[in-house]
Structures are given as structure tokens and as C-alpha cells.
Curated annotation (Swiss-Prot):
It catalyses: 5beta-cholestane-3alpha,7alpha,12alpha-triol + 6 reduced [adrenodoxin] + 3 O2 + 5 H(+) = (25R)-3alpha,7alpha,12alpha-trihydroxy-5beta-cholestan-26-oate + 6 oxidized [adrenodoxin] + 4 H2O; cholestanol + 2 reduced [adrenodoxin] + O2 + 2 H(+) = (25R)-26-hydroxycholestanol + 2 oxidized [adrenodoxin] + H2O; (25R)-3beta-hydroxycholest-5-en-7-one-26-al + 2 reduced [adrenodoxin] + O2 + H(+) = (25R)-3beta-hydroxycholest-5-en-7-one-26-oate + 2 oxidized [adrenodoxin] + H2O; (25R)-3beta,26-dihydroxycholest-5-en-7-one + 2 reduced [adrenodoxin] + O2 + 2 H(+) = (25R)-3beta-hydroxycholest-5-en-7-one-26-al + 2 oxidized [adrenodoxin] + 2 H2O. This is Sterol 26-hydroxylase, mitochondrial. The gene is CYP27A1. Pathway: Hormone biosynthesis; cholecalciferol biosynthesis; Steroid metabolism; cholesterol degradation; Lipid metabolism; bile acid biosynthesis. InterPro entries: CYP11_CYP27_families, Cyt_P450, Cyt_P450_CS, Cyt_P450_E_grp-I, Cyt_P450_sf. Expressed in the neural retina and underlying retinal pigment epithelium (at protein level). Expressed in the gray and white matter of cerebellum (at protein level). It is found in: Mitochondrion inner membrane. Its cofactor is heme. It is an enzyme of class 1 (oxidoreductase). PANTHER family: CYTOCHROME P450, CYTOCHROME P450 FAMILY 27 SUBFAMILY A MEMBER 1.
Amino acid sequence: MAALGCARLRWALRGAGRGLCPHGARAKAAIPAALPSDKATGAPGAGPGVRRRQRSLEEIPRLGQLRFFFQLFVQGYALQLHQLQVLYKAKYGPMWMSYLGPQMHVNLASAPLLEQVMRQEGKYPVRNDMELWKEHRDQHDLTYGPFTTEGHHWYQLRQALNQRLLKPAEAALYTDAFNEVIDDFMTRLDQLRAESASGNQVSDMAQLFYYFALEAICYILFEKRIGCLQRSIPEDTVTFVRSIGLMFQNSLYATFLPKWTRPVLPFWKRYLDGWNAIFSFGKKLIDEKLEDMEAQLQAAGPDGIQVSGYLHFLLASGQLSPREAMGSLPELLMAGVDTTSNTLTWALYHLSKDPEIQEALHEEVVGVVPAGQVPQHKDFAHMPLLKAVLKETLRLYPVVPTNSRIIEKEIEVDGFLFPKNTQFVFCHYVVSRDPTAFSEPESFQPHRWLRNSQPATPRIQHPFGSVPFGYGVRACLGRRIAELEMQLLLARLIQKYKVVLAPETGELKSVARIVLVPNKKVGLQFLQRQC
């Protein structure tokens, strides 16, 4: 769940400023062009006392803005921004500069460079400015959440939200809740199979996984089932689902278009309307939980209250006020849906194309959890291949193909000295497909993640080649529950069905619609296995 839509959208602008001057005098003034040549370096890998020539920033290639806009709007890369990473790395190498107005951005496209920056992060790592999200919060007097706040306040908020989520043992507490939602998912899957012409096909798995992920994360965060997996979805839930799409779809226009267009064109209003509906739905769920807690207090007194879940814990323990919860939980919700739904879609797509890996996974799953039994969190310690399938999927399709950091102090990277407030852009998509980090990088090879794999198996050659959940204190807050959620559902599916790609689906390509999604509907056939 690391990073969100605005990060991807703003990366599009990092390739170029809003003006047509590629890097004018103001941009050059942001960072000194030449650096002292005799200062000792503190770069990772440099031994004590090692001195080497520091490099001039003039050596770093610059991305021309006209080229970027031509590729974006004329050549059609607006939905292929991740592929621009591939083109730019081939042209400029693993590091290049681009500008957003006077602000310089340093794009990094190799695992060693990412590692150097990540290992020098401060106590309060700073993401790119979530300006559009903050504008909505400010207009409606809402508190900032974990993705919109920074500094010490972010640290305090993160410490509160970490509880009941961050540790594996804490995430395991949600196993029963996830399995309850998975039971309903399996029922809905069978209903859709039965309704298909073949009796075994689901025509749009990405949508079904999206509804599953939304149902699951709402149940975890708000302790409320919202009916996404029912035959007839409640009207307020339908409105909520549409509002998420409305917000994300109009984020692109809200990012690219100048502010003077907001009263004239409809996109900004639609963007705000989407957020308003999201927060309205969240407020309703929080208010219902507060009423439930008050009813318990009246009925049983303070000692009789049973803390039932995440939101209840945060409110009852005083970790968050209701107003703070209102600012934070919708942001966690936004991060929690796409990771699960997209990763599971891509995982089943690749498993359907590789029956040998799918059969090996089936044997592993039923060897630990026989048919008819429900997997539990402890079972996954004995399912290394299942974990490897998810890791390999996230390597090929990092949910958000870019991320960023604004450094809090002067740091050295690859011999270049960058001052405080430099913004680095992490090009995760091209890094995770780099042959120097992963052998046979374009192939789906889950066995590369297994310690006891055969010598001929493709290997992992750099630990920072794939970091889909981030690194350090700002790593993904919900990583453990996202992993558990995906493991539980994937195990159930492979335990019960053989998954086959529907003939009409064909080859898929990834499209950058905020996150990396398939370019068309993913139809899959689920053939029930014989016990």
C-alpha cells in the first residue's frame, strides 16, 4: 500500500515543468553546478578515510520538456508513464534530472542508487507533496492523514496507526475477519461462474477482486460489512465505490490543468465531489462505531466494553480522536484496495499461463491445508512458493510504479552531493525489471525467491531491486495485513480450482491508470478440482 495516485500523477510532471523552458536560470540556481573536488565522501561503500573526486551535477543528463510533452500527448504515453522509465533509462542511464518549474527532481533508475538514498533517510522521511489531497482537506477543515502530513506530526500519527497493524502477530488477529469475507467471495465467485455460458468463467476478475478488497479493508478498518459481495449491493455502497473512481479519474485533470480552469471546467468539482462522498461514507461508519461504543458503555460500564477491532481500539484507547480518525482512515482505505486487487489479478493471470507453476503451488497448498479446510495465518510459514508467487507478481507489477523522497539533509549519491530538500524520484518499474538486479527480468519466475531453488533458477542480485512496500520508517503501514489477505485468498482459490485463462482474454499489457492495471478485462475459468 505504499504511495498512491497523486504520486504517479505528479511523476508525469516531474519529467517536465509547466513552462517550455527546459531548465532556466532559476532551475539551475536550485543546486550548485560544481562541487568541491577534494572533500571526503560518505557514500555507502566508501571505506573510512576514502577520498575521491566529487562529481559535478552538470554531468547528470537533463530531460527536455518538449520531448516529454511530445511523448505524453502525441505519442500516447499518458497511460504508459511506466514505459517512459524504460525509454529514459535507455537514453540517459540510471540517473537523470527533470524540472517542475524551478524545482529540480533527480530520477533514479537502478537498485544501488535507490539503496543509497533510502539508507540515508532521516527520522521523518518526506514524500512528494500531496497537494491535491491537502487542498481538499483544507477546504473542508479535515485533519491530515498518514499520506498528507509530514514531520513530527506524521511520526506521532504513524506511531498511533502502527498499533494493531504493523507486526505479523498483530496482523494475524484479522485472520478470522478475512476468512469471513473470503467465504462470501467464494460464494459470489461460484454465482458468477454458474451465470456464465460455460458454467465456470468470470469475465472481469479485476472488478471482482476490487470489490473483495474494498469489502475486506472496510471490515478491518471500520469493523463494518458494506455489502460489496452481495448479489444486490446497497445503494450507499454503490455511491461510495463510484466516488472512489470519480476522485481518481479526475485527479489526472486536476493535476495537469492550471488552477484558473477550475471554475470553468468540470474536473475540479468532480474531484472534490469524489472526496466528499468518500469522507461522508467514512464519517457514517465512524459515527456508527461511536454509537456502538456508547451503547456498550451504557449497558455494561467501562469494564464491560469489549474492544472488537482496529477502529474501536484507536478510539477507545485514545490513540486517535474521532476527528483524527476521520482524517486518517479514508487515506488508509485508498491505499488498501489497489494493492490486493491488482496483485491478485496479475498473479492469477500468470498462474493461468503457467500450469506447471500452478500445479506446484496447488501441491504445496493442499500439502499444508487439505481440501475442505480453511487456511490460517500459521500455515503460510510452510508455503514458501505461495509467498514467492506474490513477491514475483509485485516485482513485475509494483502497484505504484514510482515513489519519491525529499531529503532532509545534504546527502551524497553516486559521487554527487545533493543539498537538503532535493526531491528524488524512485523509478520502481524499470528497477524491478533491470537485468543487473534480476536475471531473466521479464519472465515470471517465482522460484527465484526460494532459498533452496535449483542452481539454474534465475536469481535475485540486489535486495533493493524490488521494494513494493517501501523501506524504513515510512514503509507501508498495511504491509502485513495486505500480505495476509492475499495469502489467504490465493490459497483458497488454488486449493479448490484449476485456473485457466479465458480464450478471449489473450495477452495482457499493463496500463498506468494511477496504479498498474491490465489494459483490458481479465477473464478466467475456474475448474473445480476433484478432492
